[in-house]
């Protein structure tokens, strides 16, 4: 969300990912339908907004667009589907990124000239297919302690699953997340280790640095992307940080 304040970057918004663009759908209707979906999440999973900000006009992770090709971490996040989860770790991700690129091209036709800023944990699983589909992509890899990542993700998954089930198996959840992230990180490290060009296109950011001094990290990222950080985006980012202090909607 902070990087989305930069005038040279654009992100898929939730309302854009929620509804495939159609000629007979006006934007306001798609935005309203997406807004209603966020309110439904508030009802069935009341604690979710303290874990992850969700809004029709906010930047949205790629999990929803990936889901249109039936390759997305979101399905196992919301429901316990062990067979699908096992398949997802071994499937061919190329169809997901072929569709993903087509989708972004449609969105970009309404706002051309800006660079896409994308985010989703599932990109780790399909990192090789992503690289082939987007050979000029730059990667920002965030490094955080596994002892913090897994409980955080488990909390998010448990909140989502509680909306559709009266029982959440936390032991299963923890084990599946550890395996999911092990597979994803292994693929990222193997690709970076086997292709020096990919490694050069990666910027490593420490999570503690990001939370402690976000504007300095933003400057590193914009320099890495060769984007100017002029006064206006910097001011907008400071305003964003003041409006959205950590813990504003609770903690988990």
Where are these regions (language model features)?
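Conserved phosphate-donor/acceptor-positioning beta-strand/loop module used by diverse small-molecule
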Residues: 119-120, 130-155
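PAPS-dependent sulfation machinery
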Residues: 11-116
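Phosphate-binding beta-loop-alpha motif at adenosine-nucleotide cofactor sites
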Residues: 114-121, 137, 175, 198-220, ...
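PAPS-dependent sulfotransferase catalytic core
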Residues: 151-183, 234-252
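Flexible loop/turn segments at secondary-structure boundaries
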Residues: 95, 123-128, 147-150, 211-214
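A structural motif corresponding to the C-terminal end of an alpha-helix
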Residues: 106-110, 187-202
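Anion-recognition interface
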Residues: 120, 124-127, 140, 167-190
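Post-Walker A helix-loop "phosphate-sensing" segment adjacent to the P-loop in P-loop NTPases
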Residues: 4-12
């Amino acid at each position: 969300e902070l990087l989305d304040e930069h005038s040279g970057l654009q992100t898929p918004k939730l309302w854009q990912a929620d509804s495939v663009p159609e000629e007979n759908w006006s934007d306001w209707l798609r935005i309203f339908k997406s807004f209603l979906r966020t309110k439904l999440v508030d009802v069935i999973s009341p604690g979710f907004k303290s874990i992850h900000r969700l809004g029709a006009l906010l930047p949205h992770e790629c999990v929803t667009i990936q889901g249109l090709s039936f390759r997305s971490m979101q399905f196992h996040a919301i429901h316990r589907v062990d067979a699908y989860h096992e398949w997802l770790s071994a499937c061919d991700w190329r169809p997901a990124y072929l569709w993903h690129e087509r989708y972004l091209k449609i969105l970009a036709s309404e706002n051309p000239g800006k660079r896409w800023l994308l985010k989703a944990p599932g990109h780790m699983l399909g990192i090789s297919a992503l690289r082939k589909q987007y050979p000029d992509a730059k990667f920002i890899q965030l490094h955080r302690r596994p002892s913090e990542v897994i409980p955080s993700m488990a909390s998010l998954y448990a909140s989502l699953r509680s909306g559709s089930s009266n029982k959440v198996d936390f032991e299963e959840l923890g084990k599946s997340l550890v395996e999911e992230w092990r597979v994803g990180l292994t693929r990222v490290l193997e690709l970076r280790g086997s292709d020096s060009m990919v490694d050069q296109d990666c910027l490593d950011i420490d999570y503690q640095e990001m939370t402690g001094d976000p504007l300095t990290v933003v400057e590193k990222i914009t320099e890495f992307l060769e984007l100017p950080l002029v006064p206006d985006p910097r001011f907008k980012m400071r305003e964003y940080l003041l409006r959205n202090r950590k813990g504003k909607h609770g903690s988990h």
